[in-house]
């Protein structure tokens, strides 16, 4: 993803990413990245919440959209890093649009896992997450530096830069200007391991 400071920048970059891949306005393409924004379930559905969280759908989880589910409002997802990554879940997926107060609702389950688009993420939302490769949007940090804001005795731009840099596990790209190269290949899921997890039966401990 591209890590940014300002939400307006995030929305613009997501729109540019989708336009570069010729994504339709009202639907997601297979392979589009998503970030789980939490589970929206009433208290009485506590067991379902625990089940979704056990499958890896926790706030900040990185997912890949595989397509619509069999039921209305459901989506098939690949949860990155999960032991059993193939999940079919009731989902609320919204994509904010430039110059629009109302987001586009791609999947509108009444309740379930909520998602935001994962092509660009604010440094605030990115805290606690890590990716093999991360892009940092330099112009946003430059604006933060010019504002001269200080938080807890540390210049804001330094705090933002630290969070952004430490999100990268292997590689960091520093973006210096508003430009987006055309993708060399279409979005896809060919690099994901789609093998379903093996079912394992374990005997109960009689002394437990």
Residues of each region from the PLM?
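Conserved helicase/translocase motor-coupling segment
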Residues: 1-76, 125
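C-terminal accessory regions
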Residues: 76-207
């Amino acid at each position: 993803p591209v890590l940014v400071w300002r939400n307006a920048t995030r929305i613009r970059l997501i729109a540019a990413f989708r336009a570069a891949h010729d994504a339709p306005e009202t639907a997601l393409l297979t392979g589009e990245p998503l970030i789980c924004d939490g589970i929206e379930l009433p208290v009485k559905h506590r067991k379902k919440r625990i089940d979704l969280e056990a499958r890896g759908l926790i706030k900040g989880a990185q997912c890949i959209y595989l397509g619509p589910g069999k039921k209305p409002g459901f989506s098939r997802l690949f949860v990155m890093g999960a032991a059993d990554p193939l999940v079919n879940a009731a989902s609320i997926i919204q994509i904010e649009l430039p110059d629009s107060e109302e987001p586009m609702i791609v999947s509108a389950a009444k309740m379930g896992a909520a998602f935001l688009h994962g092509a660009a993420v604010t440094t605030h939302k990115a805290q606690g997450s890590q990716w093999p490769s991360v892009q940092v949007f330099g112009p946003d940090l430059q604006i933060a530096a010019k504002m001269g804001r200080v938080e807890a005795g540390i210049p804001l731009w330094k705090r933002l830069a630290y969070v952004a840099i430490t999100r990268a596990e292997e590689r960091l790209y520093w973006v210096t200007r508003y430009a987006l190269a055309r993708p060399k290949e279409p979005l896809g899921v060919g690099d994901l391991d789609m093998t379903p997890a093996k079912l394992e039966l374990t005997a109960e401990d009689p002394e437990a």
